[in-house]
Amino acid sequence: VLITGSNRGIGFAFVQHYSKNGWNVIATCRNPNKADDLQLLMKNSTNIFIEEMDVTDFEEINTLAQKYQGYPIDVLVNNAGILGNVPKQSFGNLDYDLFQTVMAVNAFGPLKVAEAFADSVAISNQKKIVTMTSGLGSFAIMGNFDRFFFYKMSKSAINMGVLTMNASLKSKGIIAALISPGMVDTKLLDESGYQGRNKISPEESVAGLVKIIAEISLDTMK
């Protein structure tokens, strides 16, 4: 399994879960040297491989994909994501440089990572690419909610991207799916200003997500 944004939050919980259950885990993040919890977890494990990869740096993505060329990756988890500065996502005060950054991380990045590692996924047994989405990207749920312009637009974009990716990769037997973690107690949720009581821990979220990932099949994606 390859997991992006694995240094904290949901990504780190994915690394914990999969490594504990005997998977070889390629844990990627922007700054491995600053990922203290991840480094400690690796030292106490034999199946975690930490790699530097910024999902907005296409050269880094291509280099890492080359390194693992011919190595089967059963599950690719596109987890890396950012919310972005909230006040700068209000109409009348929109920061379009920030828009580029949020789109680069949340929409362009997952698509590029999937494209770069698709050959490794194709030669695996499970052949799954899963990408984190959010209810904030839903027209039905959040269409009338006036905050988080860029985050919402980036999630809507990657939602369509993954649907199109699934159609594009079916001939290779690859499944591309969206998964939503729920209201998880992470730095991103804190940045959003959410004050609700229904938050769950990253570990709780991942326990449910890995079951969904395990049950995803070509039949369930029809």
Functional labels for PLM-detected ranges:
Residues 21-36:
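Conserved glycine-rich Rossmann-like NAD(P)H-binding loop of the short-chain dehydrogenase/reductase
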Residues 3-4, 78-79, 128-134, 175-180:
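Structural signature of the Rossmann-like NAD(P)-dependent dehydrogenase/reductase core
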Residues 159, 165, 169-184, 220-222:
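Conserved Rossmann-fold SDR core element
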Residues 82-83, 90-103, 122-171:
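Catalytic loop of short-chain dehydrogenase/reductase
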Residues 7, 11-16:
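N-terminal Rossmann NAD(P)H-binding glycine-rich loop of SDR-like oxidoreductase domains
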Residues 178, 186, 190-222:
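C-terminal helical subdomain
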Residues 51-63:
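The beta1-alpha1 cofactor-binding region of Rossmann-like NAD(H)/NADP(H)-dependent oxidoreductases
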